[in-house]
């Protein structure tokens, strides 16, 4: 009957509201974890532990891997650029896992720097966007998915904008600006396009 349908709708709306609130609270907790500024502030084990702590705040574990493999789409790392990745799988089997490529040419330097934590925050942002929008590539982001994801990581996970900009210099699809910040905020507010 109509009354039970209204009750069901109300219950679902409340569950969604609670889930979004929990997601945003976890993002804020991850952002609150202090990240040292300089490479030498921690040794590689310390940086990895810090990155793992940030991920675990979101209920995510980091898997180190030697080759790109996302749901059977394995093979060459596109342009050798991908250093970490998050897989969006229809069955949610990878929902709480992010991957770091230890074969990336810059892995040795990355493993000894705060850039590792920013990379993790970027991948966690893909996950948050996927949870909020049902996809890592929401319509609102258009062809700016990576830039919007970077903006999301800066605005809601506390990633370092300058460090990201320096590390990804010359890679246009990752370049943040006021518009990518606006789109990330819209997604965070529940507008996926």
Sequence positions of predicted segments:
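Long, low-complexity, Ser/Thr/Pro- and Asp/Glu-rich intrinsically disordered
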Residues: 71-81, 98-100, 122, 151, ...
